[in-house]
């Protein structure tokens, strides 16, 4: 694949409670054909909206709230899965090449917005109740304010799934098991630092590149959530999931081109804002509800779930301490970390995910 926009184009014309396909032509200055709907073009790195249910929910809500008068045209596979694809989405929105975009919060610490790195602090946000508490705090709005330096306007931070270590030959438990391995991940300063701190080498590889690198043995594991692990057909290539190690959650950040937002009417902007707020509010319950069924599917496909011992967990945290030291060098990021740590102290983690009988590693 070559860098740049992929040809896959999906138009989501969402009206009332249904979605339909449409195309736009001959737009006026508000972005719509005379008398027709406003069409907003959205860059997205995956192959389709189903890869990020909270983002798909935002798109659906825009259609419902606007009665179909605002449509979001999703341009999938933006960046063709190259390591810098998510950064390309941000830049495309900033320059007005597209109107809207979304990217994982992980990428922004590589683009001069370090505050989002607190969301990727390893093994900090390790439960869905805590992730939900973070979203319901002041943190998202404070983090989104930093996006102005990238010439985009933040709309919302959406919760997404917890990501685990997944490996080819054996479960990744204590740091000694990580030593010398190459681990697939996404472009992220914090996440790449964490993998190095555990003794492994980070390799930015996702989409078809992850599959290719697994087949060639270039990577021996990766960080991913169980839902995508099943959906992307990766179980046969890497069977071992460490169930009780949540490295970090994925957060999906929605943003818009400021000039394009200004060209909309006040009502159209309000629909976008309401859709973003609603999607953020329900994002964690949406993805958390898929976790149990995904574990069962993975088990049926041959995955095996391992449990790190208390000693393993302590060793992991000790190795990862250097990542926190680096995060705390930025005053704002340090403040964000302290707020998340306080939320963690006051938020019960909820029950551990149930692992089906016969699905534990070694069985």
Which ranges hold each PLM region?
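N-terminal secretory/targeting leader peptides
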Residues: 21-125, 153-363
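Secretory targeting and sorting signals
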Residues: 2-24
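Non-membrane alpha-helical secondary structure
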Residues: 1, 6-7, 312, 332
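Short, solvent-exposed loop/beta-turn-alpha elements that line the ligand-binding surface or hinge
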Residues: 126-149
């Amino acid at each position: 694949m070559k860098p740049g926009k992929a040809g896959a184009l999906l138009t989501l014309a969402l009206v009332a409670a249904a979605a339909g396909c449409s195309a736009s032509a001959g737009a006026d200055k508000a972005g719509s054909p005379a008398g027709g709907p406003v069409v907003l073009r959205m860059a997205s790195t995956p192959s389709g909206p189903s890869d990020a249910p909270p983002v798909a929910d935002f798109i659906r809500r825009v259609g419902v709230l606007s009665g179909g008068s605002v449509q979001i045209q999703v341009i999938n596979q933006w960046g063709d899965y190259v390591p810098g694809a998510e950064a390309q989405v941000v830049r495309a929105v900033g320059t007005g090449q597209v109107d809207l975009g979304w990217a994982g919060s992980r990428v922004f610490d590589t683009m001069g917005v370090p505050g989002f790195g607190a969301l990727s602090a390893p093994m900090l946000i390790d439960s869905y109740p805590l992730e939900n508490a973070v979203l319901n705090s002041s943190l998202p709005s404070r983090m989104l304010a930093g996006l102005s330096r990238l010439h985009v306007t933040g709309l919302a931070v959406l919760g997404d799934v917890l990501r685990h270590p997944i490996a080819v030959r054996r479960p990744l438990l204590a740091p000694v098991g990580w030593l010398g391995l190459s681990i697939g991940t996404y472009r992220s300063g914090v996440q790449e630092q964490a993998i190095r701190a555990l003794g492994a080498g980070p390799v930015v590889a996702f989409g078809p590149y992850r599959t290719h690198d697994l087949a060639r043995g270039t990577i021996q594991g990766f960080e991913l959530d169980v839902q995508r692990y099943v959906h992307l057909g990766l179980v046969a290539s890497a069977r071992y999931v460490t169930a009780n190690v949540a490295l970090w959650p994925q957060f999906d950040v929605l943003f818009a081109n400021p000039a394009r937002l200004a060209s909309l009417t006040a009502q159209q902007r309000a629909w976008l804002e309401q859709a973003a707020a609603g999607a953020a509010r329900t994002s964690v319950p949406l993805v958390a509800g898929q976790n149990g069924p995904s574990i069962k599917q993975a088990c049926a496909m041959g995955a095996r779930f391992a449990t790190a011992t208390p000693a393993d967990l302590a060793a992991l945290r000790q190795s990862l301490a250097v990542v926190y030291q680096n995060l705390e060098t930025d005053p704002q990021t340090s403040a964000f970390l302290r707020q998340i740590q306080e939320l963690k102290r006051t938020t019960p983690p909820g029950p551990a995910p149930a692992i089906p009988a016969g699905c534990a590693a070694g069985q």
